Amino acid sequence: MGKIIGIDLGTTNSCIAIVEGTKTRVLENSEGDRTTPSIVAYTQDGEILVGQPAKRQSATNPKNTLFAIKRLIGRRFEDEEVQRDVDIMPYKIIAADNGDAWLEIKGQKIAPPQVSAEILKKMKKTAEDYLGESVTEAVITVPAYFNDTQRQATKDAGRIAGLEVKRIINEPTAAALAYGLDKEIGNRTIAVYDLGGGTFDISIIEIDDVDGEKTFEVLATNGDTHLGGEDFDSRLINYLVDEFKKDQGIDLRNDPLAMQRLKEAAEKAKIELSAAQQTDVNLPYITADSTGPKHMNLKITRAKLESLVEDLVNRTMDPLKVALTDASLSISDIKDVILVGGQTRMPLVQKKVTDFFCKEPRKDVNPDEAVAIGAAVQGGVLSGNVKDVLLLDVTPLSLGIETMGGVMTALIAKNTTIPTKHSQIFSTAEDNQSAVTIHVLQGERKRAMDNKSLGQFNLDGIAPAMRGIPQIEVTFDIDADGILHVSAKDNNSGREQKITIKASSGLSEEEIKKMVREAEANAESDRKFEELVQTRNQADNLMHSTRKQLAEYGNQLLQEDRNAIENAIQSLNTALKGESKTDIETNIQSLIQVSSKLLKLTQQQNQATNDNVKTDGNVVDAEFEEVKDKK
């Protein structure tokens, strides 16, 4: 079995790690960075840029540069969280034919899993470049509070990228693995506070260490899948826009280019204010009107930023209380607090967490890398390379069915350790009822329609009887991958119906296969483009060296030989302007052939120069004696 890589597919940044022997290693991407911006750009000439290259051009291509796509994955267009983003994102969010939230780029509809797949492809390539072998399997992390649809959409993204997703695990759980694997920590209960670019999670995790065998059991989890650093950025952006409007009378919200520059500046200022008390937002030529160009130059203090976002930080406090209650623990039971996600570097966040738990969070866990490391550890467990580790995760939301009166009746409560199985007896609501519809739901609301519908099926052939007499046994069975199997059995007749809930990501099997084919075609196109660039570079180097040799030694060649070389250089230069790798290679060989005499002449001259240096009579052998200064 090959390596199973660990990927933290983040809202703002993504990270990849592997297990080497007994150690984990975070891999650097092609730009030399340990994290990759989760940004994908579609350029005018059809190229797809991922990471820093996409981020660098975002100011000039805002409508075709996609970021924070994780906030849309697995969501419906009419969802309140999506509608909040529709008005503030520079790119176009649309409703797909099935009602899901999709993107529109240059008139083409794109599903969020397709965009995430581009990021995963870069992660996959990073691993393959380092390992020198093909990588086909991965463990990918998701927020603990992601529902089944969001998890399935993430798995689909992996599949489109050419990865078999061996396991989807929760980000706080992965961080706990990274924290606890190589530490002699004994038994303890920890809290993982994960505030990333777009999502927030809190997980209470118990680590049992018995004779070196560690069990990581999630006791409770809670969170908000639409709260993170992007929201902090938006608060600062809105403040800057309002201040500029007061000063200049111009609303920058109508200028996509200005807003993209402002987004970058706000993110930079937010990061700087984690270390400094004050920073400047200086954006010359941010816009212009009839009176001329306008510049933005504003001072932002840490106190001002904190006043803008304090309510967002406070929103993370209630889930902490709920998680502790669900775990039947008090604050004093928590031995360590782990901070995960870049937004936890903000001093205000650290202070609020410290005040809540009455203890300082640990500083020995890298908030940007811990999740990817934990995913790699889980990959090592699945491949058999990591021993003595058992991970017991939970289902984040309750699972149940719709019963009489439109009520959701839960069969499996939230925070139940998986895998798990639970059965319950139900009956008919009317006399002589011959069939029942089993409507499977996920969520915490009492009213069925307020929860997430996962699917439904019918059990018919029930023998006529007074209502309440038939016994219908409904069984929910969740496996280790979080896939739900539901069955309904009439205990009187023995008739049974089953359904496997592989939560739909909104993409049909045919759509996924089509996207996989497109991704494979793009991979071939990318490979050809890379080969073309390498051939062009080879041609450039050859022309440069040949011109240099011709300038130095061309007067020692016959005129016809010089003409042949110059003509070959000109032909190669013309071929470089085209897109044919074969044409460039043919002209490279032609230039090498006609310049063979020049090359031989150059080598002879270089050899003669080297010989002269060796026999230079002015070089004197001498012995030196070290002379020490007299003190």
Curated annotation (Swiss-Prot):
PROSITE patterns assigned: HSP70_1, HSP70_2, HSP70_3
Annotated positions of the Phosphothreonine modification: 199
UniProt keyword Transmembrane, yes or no: no
GO molecular function annotation: ATP binding; ATP-dependent protein folding chaperone; unfolded protein binding
Induction line: By stress conditions e.g. heat shock.
SUPFAM superfamilies: Actin-like ATPase domain, Heat shock protein 70kD (HSP70), peptide-binding domain
Xref: Pfam families: HSP70
CDD domains the UniProt entry points to: ASKHA_NBD_HSP70_DnaK-like
Keyword entries, A-Z: ATP-binding, Chaperone, Nucleotide-binding, Phosphoprotein, Stress response
InterPro entries: ATPase_NBD (IPR043129), Chaperone_DnaK (IPR012725), Heat_shock_70_CS (IPR018181), HSP70_C_sf (IPR029048), HSP70_peptide-bd_sf (IPR029047), Hsp_70_fam (IPR013126)
UniProt similarity note: Belongs to the heat shock protein 70 family.
Function, as annotated: Acts as a chaperone.
The protein, known as: Chaperone protein DnaK
Gene: dnaK
